Amino acid sequence: MTTLFISDLHLDPARPAITELFLEFLRTQVPGSDALYILGDLFEAWIGDDTPSTAADAVAVALHAVADSGVPVFFMAGNRDFLVGETYAQRAGFRILPDPTVIDLYGHTTLLMHGDLLCTDDTAYQAFRAQTRDPVFQAQFLAQPLAARVAFAQQARAASQARHAELKQGDQSRFETVTDVSPAEVEATFVRYGLDRLIHGHTHRPAIHTLQAGGHTCTRIVLGDWYEQGSVLRVDADGASLEQLAL
């Protein structure tokens, strides 16, 4: 049997082909699996479960069908969709997991994260993350009219794009450092949890890394994004493999 992991789909009405690829994946590749884990950024943006979206409705129906077939579906919030709540979770039939989460994966204890917590060199983002993950901030934000939430999300996205563009125009090595995980934080995370395998997304740099942490050989598996193709990690009792899904 196999457990599937995906992240960083960034589903958006502006990219319907990716949504269709995901729906096809749910119909044809997920049935019969042991579980499906979505480790954040399922959606490009999420400003509340009350936001009208035909695409999100279709995704909810498809995910619920997977769950109804006997394949449990788990969702961990990313930096784009951290406001996904229990209302949508019930519609989609998935269980929301905290970040980080430890699971038993065929006898191998494994740490799951979205991955943004590992990017500690990006201090500006970490400050923004701390603010927006605060329950008081979220309650106040969700209480605002939909139009105000849309405006805030657009402003935040524009600011993020401008910052990334500025970084790209500067020192390329600095851009790569800021947008990737901190090696020191990765090592500290392995030591903190006392585990030797970590699965995460966020950086859009799919790979399977082997490293030393706390005197142990550890494995860090990075999930791929769904911008120009699909990406899935398949894990079974014999190992793990990253695969691309063609449009």
Swiss-Prot record:
GO cellular component, one term: cytoplasm
SS bond partners: none
Catalyzed chemical reaction(s): UDP-2-N,3-O-bis[(3R)-3-hydroxytetradecanoyl]-alpha-D-glucosamine + H2O = 2-N,3-O-bis[(3R)-3-hydroxytetradecanoyl]-alpha-D-glucosaminyl 1-phosphate + UMP + 2 H(+)
Keywords (A to Z) from UniProt: Cell inner membrane, Cell membrane, Hydrolase, Lipid A biosynthesis, Lipid biosynthesis, Lipid metabolism, Manganese, Membrane, Metal-binding
Main location per the UniProt record: membrane
Pfam families per record: Metallophos (PF00149)
Comment on bound cofactor: Binds 2 Mn(2+) ions per subunit in a binuclear metal center.
Gene3D superfamilies assigned: 3.60.21.10
Localization: Cell inner membrane
Record-listed substrate binding positions: 79-80, 122, 160, 171, 174, 202
Residue sites binding Mn(2+) 2 per the record: 41, 79, 114, 202
Residues the entry annotates as binding Mn(2+) 1: 8, 10, 41, 204
Enzyme Commission code(s) on record: 3.6.1.54
Pathway membership: Glycolipid biosynthesis; lipid IV(A) biosynthesis; lipid IV(A) from (3R)-3-hydroxytetradecanoyl-[acyl-carrier-protein] and UDP-N-acetyl-alpha-D-glucosamine: step 4/6
UniProt GO BP: lipid A biosynthetic process
Superkingdom: Bacteria
InterPro entries cross-referenced by the UniProt entry: Calcineurin-like_PHP_ApaH, LpxH-like, Metallo-depent_PP-like, UDP-diacylglucosamine_Hdrlase
Membrane topology: Peripheral membrane protein
Required cofactor(s): Mn(2+)
Role of this protein: Hydrolyzes the pyrophosphate bond of UDP-2,3-diacylglucosamine to yield 2,3-diacylglucosamine 1-phosphate (lipid X) and UMP by catalyzing the attack of water at the alpha-P atom. Involved in the biosynthesis of lipid A, a phosphorylated glycolipid that anchors the lipopolysaccharide to the outer membrane of the cell.
Membership in a protein family: Belongs to the LpxH family.
Name of the molecule in the record: UDP-2,3-diacylglucosamine hydrolase
